[in-house]
């Protein structure tokens, strides 16, 4: 069976690996190819802050909460393994801060040691009157993509740098299944009015003295628009920019100033941090993740397409659960193909 995965960010590579791990023994051979116009270190995943934390509000699709939980448990199972260092995986603790009381998040029992902040702790953060503390996971995107790539190539999966302009150009080569993990660019392959780019700009800093993540929340501003700093495995990430429908890739000076000013208070402790770099990326924003299948006609034959995109700014948080779901869809395709080849019963 021939399978093509389009996209080489965390969604594309993890989905490819999950499908290959679950079905390579049942399909001999399983010929899998990954096409992408950008590979690590040039993907959005490479510069993501990497903290496992879903949105505070419940997702409109309840399955998304399950996919995030599955991802946390999958990563946590690796935390004491020899692979953790190569994956760029570590435990991290920190604070979510608010100006007024808010309901507990649905993921409070997924993370470790979730609790409300004490008054003494809140004294460390002037201007904030409510908050949480918990231990979560941090995943360095670049290290993780390299780890996934190595596992895929060891399995014989082929990776090619190629910009796919349409499903037809891939399906025409005798491909049985296409897995669409193109993120914010999915509309170029098939129009999707629900998909929008959510432009973000972050600053990477060398601040080894910052040991805990600090994420502030302002419901009036919306998600991603409040200051945050997230220590990483190698460098910290300073941010707080989100512009929906904005495509320019260059760094904007006003956004740089916004990030720096927002994280300039005494509790941020980033004033003297050395700036390592600054990046702009696009979150594939959609009301719900598109994770489903459809059939496309390519001449006389039909090609199955599994869509897996629209993860917003939390692809690393939800990737493995989505990969498992995509693999289930792949399994259903196999069952249907097997049934269609069975001779009819004469009973």
UniProtKB/Swiss-Prot annotation:
Its main location: other. FAD binds at residues 8-11, 37-38, 43, 45, 49-51, 163-164, 182, 283, 312-313, 315-317. Pfam families: DAO (PF01266). One of its GO terms (biological process) is D-alanine catabolic process. It comes from the Eukaryota. This is D-amino-acid oxidase. A motif (Microbody targeting signal) lies at residues 345-347. Gene3D superfamilies: D-Amino Acid Oxidase, subunit A, domain 2, NAD(P)-binding Rossmann-like Domain. It comes from Oryctolagus cuniculus (Rabbit).
């Amino acid at each position: 069976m021939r399978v093509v995965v389009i996209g080489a960010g965390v969604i594309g590579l993890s989905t490819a690996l999950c499908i290959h791990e679950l079905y390579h023994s049942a399909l001999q051979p399983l010929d899998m190819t990954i096409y992408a116009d950008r590979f690590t270190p040039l993907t959005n995943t490479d510069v993501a802050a990497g903290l496992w934390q879903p949105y505070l509000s419940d997702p409109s699709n309840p399955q998304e909460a399950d996919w995030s939980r599955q991802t946390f448990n999958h990563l946590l199972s690796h935390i004491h393994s020899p692979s953790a260092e190569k994956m760029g995986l570590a435990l991290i603790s920190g604070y979510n801060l608010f100006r007024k009381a808010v309901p507990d998040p649905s993921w409070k029992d997924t993370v470790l040691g979730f609790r409300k902040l004490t008054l003494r702790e809140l004294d460390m953060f002037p201007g904030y009157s409510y908050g949480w503390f918990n231990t979560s996971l941090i995943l360095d995107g670049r290290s993780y993509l390299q780890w996934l790539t190595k596992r895929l190539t060891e399995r014989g999966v082929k990776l090619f740098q190629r910009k796919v302009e349409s499903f037809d150009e891939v399906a025409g080569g005798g491909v049985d299944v296409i897995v669409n993990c193109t993120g914010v660019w999915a509309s170029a392959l098939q129009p999707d009015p629900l998909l929008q780019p959510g432009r973000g700009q972050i600053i990477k800093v060398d601040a080894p003295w910052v040991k805990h993540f600090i994420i502030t929340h302002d419901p009036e501003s919306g998600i991603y628009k409040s200051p945050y700093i997230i220590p990483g495995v190698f460098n910290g990430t300073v941010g707080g920019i989100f512009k929906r429908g904005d495509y320019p890739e260059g760094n904007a000076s006003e956004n740089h100033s916004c990030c720096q000013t927002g994280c300039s208070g005494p509790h941020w402790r980033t004033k003297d941090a050395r700036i390592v770099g600054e990046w702009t990326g696009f979150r594939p924003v959609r009301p719900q993740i598109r994770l489903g299948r459809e059939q496309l006609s390519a001449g006389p034959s039909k090609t199955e397409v599994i869509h897996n995109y629209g993860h917003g700014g939390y692809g690393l948080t939800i990737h493995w659960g989505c990969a498992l779901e995509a693999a289930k869809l792949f399994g259903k395709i196999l069952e249907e193909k097997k049934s269609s080849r069975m001779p009819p019963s004469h009973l």
